[in-house]
Design a protein with these regions (language model features):
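Absolute protein N-terminus
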Residues: 1-2
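Short alpha-helix capping/helix-loop boundary micro-motifs
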Residues: 24-27
Length: 75
């Protein structure tokens, strides 16, 4: 299982599953991180947190902990 946290800068992946429950999962879905969405990793901060991604044509920064909950496959 590859998570969004494992994706290298410049790669594009597709979301296959969101882990997590309740408000955390709902928040991720509200910002466009849904099953089947294409995600491009733009950059990662020096200490690895946060991760800047592009999803549905807008930029988004997420924490490492949130990126660990997003299961992805290469596009």
């Amino acid at each position: 299982m590859q998570t969004l946290r494992d994706v290298a800068v410049g790669e594009t992946v597709k979301i296959v599953k969101l882990h997590g429950q309740g408000a955390v999962k709902r928040r991720m879905m509200d910002v466009g991180l849904t099953k089947g969405a294409s995600v491009h990793v733009q950059k990662v901060a020096p200490l690895g947190d946060p991760i800047e991604i592009t999803v549905r044509n807008y930029a988004l920064s997420i924490r490492k902990a949130d990126a660990d909950m997003i299961e992805v496959v290469p596009e």
